[in-house]
Swiss-Prot record:
Primary subcellular site in the record, as a coarse category: cytoplasm
NCBIfam families: PRK00051.1
Subunit and partners: Homodimer.
Organism: Cereibacter sphaeroides (strain ATCC 17025 / ATH 2.4.3)
Pfam families for this protein: PRA-CH
Name the record gives this protein: Phosphoribosyl-AMP cyclohydrolase
This protein's pathway: Amino-acid biosynthesis; L-histidine biosynthesis; L-histidine from 5-phospho-alpha-D-ribose 1-diphosphate: step 3/9
Gene symbol of the encoding locus: hisI
Function: Catalyzes the hydrolysis of the adenine ring of phosphoribosyl-AMP.
Length: 119
């Protein structure tokens, strides 16, 4: 059965959350938003394209930084309202130059940063 991005369940803004995960290690790298066109562009090019809510424009991950995300596999959750992008990440995924955007943990009631920026 052919996949149609319109078959996903989008929110009122026409967006669906997309979680980027390293395909080899399983590490969760980031979460961003996609609309139907971003999903289609990602599938067509193999380069992950998100929708920037602040800029109201497409955002090809790594287009300016060189820290690209290559799509290995796109997975859809059971409600069709969230995507899991299995990717190959080149360089850091986070704009803070960390491998993952999830670099702060709450441990024993206190926030603790456990990932340093990549050199």
């Amino acid at each position: 059965m052919a996949f149609d991005p319109a078959s996903l369940t989008y929110d009122a803004r026409g967006l669906v959350p997309a979680i980027a995960q390293d395909h080899a290690t399983g590490e969760v790298l980031m979460m961003a938003w996609m609309n139907a066109e971003a999903v289609a562009r990602t599938l067509e090019t193999g380069r992950v394209t998100y929708w920037s809510r602040s800029r109201q424009s497409f955002w090809v991950k790594g287009e300016t930084s060189g820290h690209i995300q290559r799509l290995v596999e796109l997975r859809i959750d059971c409600d069709r309202d969230c995507l899991l992008l299995l990717i190959e990440q080149v360089g850091p995924a986070c704009h803070t130059h960390r491998r993952s955007c999830f670099y702060t943990a709450v441990r024993e009631g206190a926030e603790q940063v456990f990932l340093d920026p990549m050199g």
